[in-house]
Amino acid sequence: MKTLIKYNLLLVSLIFCFTPTQEVKSQDFGADVASSYVWRGTQFGTGPHVQPWMELGAGNLTGGIWGSFALDATRNASDNELDLWVSYDFGPLALTVTNYSFPGADGTYSAGGVFDGDIEVSGSTSLGPVDLTVGYFTDLEALYIEAGFPIGPVGVAVGYGSDGAGAFYAGGDSGLVNVSFSGEKDIKITEDYSLPVFGSFIYNPDAEAAFLVFGFSL
């Protein structure tokens, strides 16, 4: 199953590469710089990270690359992450397959390669004001369910993790792993440019860990 998903990801990537330019409806790229990298209630690495991304879209199909790299690469080389993903929007439901990989400081892999990462299949939908996401890692047998909703200008997310094959979200068990409160605003730099900034307070009840993250987008 994992091998099949990897080949499908590679196939979709090749389709995007050889699709005529006029058929690619959208493309975008950018980067975030964050004081630390916290994902689903768990901190990955220490210190600030730069997180570039690129994506292409053709109709309801979208594919992209997302990365996270420690700014101090010599000290935190193991913190690097490079993810490939493809998503199809069916209207009320979007399905996404993501390949998570972890290259070294020089971009190479100690085992396998960029297509030999951990595979997650996820679905997302909206139920009124609530955004619901369910993700499942096929080899790790780890399940994550998150509900996100606004309270005024504040974005709130509540995430539940359940581990199967080993410790991942909740130390080999299951529980509430992510309660976060986020906000964002634009800081005016010039008449024509404002810098988007964001901040999040993240609490992991299962691990009894708390984080405060600040960042900006380019």
What are these regions (language model features)?
Residues M1-D28:
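Cleavable N-terminal export/targeting peptides
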Residues E23-S26, N60, P92, S126-P129, ...:
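Short loop/turn motifs that connect adjacent beta-strands in outer-membrane beta-barrel proteins
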Residues V24-D72, V134:
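Short glycine/proline- and aromatic-enriched beta-strand/turn motifs that initiate or cap beta-hairpins
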Residues G30-A34, E55, G64-S68, S87, ...:
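Transmembrane beta-strands of outer-membrane beta-barrel proteins
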Residues T46-V50, S78-L82, F115-V121, D139-I145, ...:
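Residues that define the transmembrane beta-barrel architecture of outer-membrane proteins
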Residues G63-D89, L95-G113:
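Surface-exposed loop and membrane-interface regions of Gram-negative outer-membrane beta-barrel proteins
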Residues Y109-G166, G171-S174:
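Detector for outer-membrane/organellar transmembrane beta-barrel domains
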Residues T125, F149, F181-G183, I187, ...:
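Outer-membrane beta-barrel "beta-signal"
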